Structure formats: structure tokens, C-alpha cells
């Protein structure tokens, strides 16, 4: 599917802004989840600034689409997107991760625009499934859609697959799971812990409409999201192949999970993103 070049350029520019603001947040907070935040930045951008139905002026609008970030530690790009969209003042970035601040190191629902208070991995898809089923109660068509971003490492958790089975059984077709498949988790490559390959076929076998894409290619991201709306009767999985730390070439493909930014790292990142 072809998209307007101006739209793609605008989304790329927005993603660069989110990555830059993420660097500023992590620098202000002393440390943060750099790699996983950067790998999901293009997905977050496509959702927040093109695909989702939401209203920053009315964060609790009943018909809004829900974005559940199960990998809730990678909250920095989510906060950056919400601030950029106007859910809160960007000055909140400066207090990220500090005691008593609104923006903490995992997503919390006290933050305008955040739908899910995260922490332990593997739980977000179950929460998203409940939200998606609630949207269908007493209605011929769902009131809203639910999008859940998972890390590939957290797919080691059995609870994820319980939710996968339940969603397929109940044909919850207003639920879209997006797997940020950057191939790393805390401490190792994902394949060295529990090998999840073939990822797409697993979701398909469990009864999902599953596809795989380049998670940094906006045409592929937007096409997959739009196609999910056109395929009734099944929940949808998008396995997005991504690069950890995408956006700063010197950091890419490195397992910079939770890290402190040195002055040199900050300068290197801002030379690309600033």
C-alpha cells in the first residue's frame, strides 16, 4: 500500500523528536531503558500520530483506542509521544524517574494518556484482552480498538500464551498485539534464553491473523495496522523486526538495556538527533 511521502517524512521527523526527548529524559533521570525505547519508537510514532483514535484534550474519552505497553519499562518513548501530542507539559520530562515525579520508570495510569500501570512483564496482553472484550459488551461492533506492544523477551512468560489462546477462542478481532522483536532481552540475546523462532508461525498456530514486518519501515507498519482493521473474526499479531537502539548508529545492535548515559554517549546521540 502506498502512502503520501509527506506523511512518511512527517512521521520520521516525529520519531526523531521522540528519540531526542527520550535521550534528554534518560539524561535527566540518571539512567533509563534506552535500547527498547528506541526499538519501539517508530511503532509508537505510527500509532500515536496516525493510526490511533484519541483526544489529548479528553484523555478519558470513552471511544478512544487503547494503547497498552506491556513492556512498560520502555516508557520513555511513550512519555515523549504523549508530551509531543499535548497530554501534558514537556517540562515534566526534566523530573523523569525522580522521587515524587509524575513520570516514573514504569508506566503508571496517573499519567494522562497512560492506560496501563506496568511492572512485571508478561501481563500486558491479558490486560489488553480484557479491555478489548469490554469494548464488545452489548454492542454489535466494538466501541474501540486495543493495541498492545510486547517485548520479544517477555514472550517467554506463560501468561502471554494463555491470553493468546483466550483471544483466539473468543475471536477478539479488535485486539492487535505488536511484538517489538529486537532480538535482545535483559542480559542476553532472546534466542539464548528461550528460542522463540518461528515467532509468526506460533501466533498463527494459536489462531491469530499474524504477519511480520520491518518495524522501522513506515509503509509496512501502516499497512499492517490498516490490514488488521480489514480482517474480522481473529485477533491480530504484528511481529515487528526491529533494531535495539535504532536511531543512533553507534548504539545500534548493542544490548543497551537499562543504562546510564555518559557525557560522551549523550553528545554522540545528540549529534545525530539534536
State where each predicted segment sits.
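Thiamine diphosphate
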Residues: 113, 117-120, 124-231
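N-terminal hydrophobic or amphipathic helices/low-complexity stretches enriched
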Residues: 1-18
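Cofactor-binding active-site loop characterized by glycine-rich and histidine/acidic residues
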Residues: 22-25, 37-169
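Generic beta-sheet signal
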Residues: 65-67, 144-148, 175, 234-242
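Short acidic, glycine/serine/threonine-rich loops at helix termini
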Residues: 79-81, 108, 159-161, 187-191, ...
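Glycine/aspartate-rich loop-and-adjacent alpha/beta segment that forms the canonical ThDP
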Residues: 218-274
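N-terminal capping segment at the start of a domain
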Residues: 14-31, 180-182
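Glycine-rich beta-alpha junction loops
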Residues: 73-74, 78, 182-183, 217, ...
Amino acid at each position: 500500500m502506498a502512502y503520501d511521502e509527506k506523511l512518511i517524512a512527517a512521521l520520521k521527523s516525529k520519531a526523531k523528536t521522540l528519540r531526542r526527548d527520550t535521550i534528554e529524559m534518560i539524561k535527566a533521570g540518571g539512567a533509563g531503558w534506552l535500547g527498547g525505547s528506541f526499538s519501539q519508537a517508530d511503532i509508537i510514532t505510527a500509532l500515536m500520530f496516525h493510526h490511533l483514535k484519541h483526544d489529548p484534550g479528553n484523555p478519558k474519552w470513552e471511544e478512544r483506542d487503547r494503547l497498552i505497553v506491556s513492556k512498560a519499562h520502555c516508557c520513555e518513548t511513550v512519555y515523549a509521544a504523549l508530551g509531543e501530542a499535548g497530554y501534558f507539559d514537556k517540562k515534566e520530562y526534566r523530573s523523569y524517574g525522580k522521587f515524587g515525579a509524575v513520570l516514573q520508570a514504569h508506566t503508571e495510569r496517573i499519567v494522562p494518556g497512560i492506560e496501563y500501570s506496568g511492572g512485571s512483564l508478561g501481563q500486558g496482553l491479558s490486560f489488553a484482552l480484557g479491555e478489548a472484550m469490554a469494548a464488545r459488551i452489548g454492542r454489535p461492533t466494538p466501541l474501540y480498538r486495543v493495541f498492545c506492544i510486547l517485548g520479544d523477551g517477555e514472550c517467554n512468560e506463560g501468561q502471554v500464551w494463555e491470553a493468546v489462546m483466550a483471544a483466539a477462542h473468543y475471536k477478539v478481532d479488535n485486539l492487535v498485539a505488536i511484538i517489538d522483536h529486537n532480538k535482545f532481552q535483559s542480559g542476553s540475546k532472546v534466542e539464548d534464553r528461550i528460542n522463540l523462532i518461528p515467532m509468526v508461525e506460533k501466533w498463527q498456530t494459536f489462531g491469530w491473523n499474524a504477519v511480520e514486518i520491518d518495524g522501522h519501515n513506515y509503509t509496512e507498519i501502516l499497512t499492517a495496522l490498516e490490514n488488521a482493521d480489514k480482517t474480522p473474526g481473529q485477533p491480530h499479531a504484528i511481529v515487528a523486526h526491529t533494531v535495539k537502539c535504532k536511531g543512533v548508529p553507534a548504539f545500534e545492535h548493542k544490548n543497551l538495556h537499562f543504562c546510564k548515559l555518559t557525557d560522551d554517549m549523550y553528545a554522540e546521540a545528540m549529534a545525530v538527533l539534536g
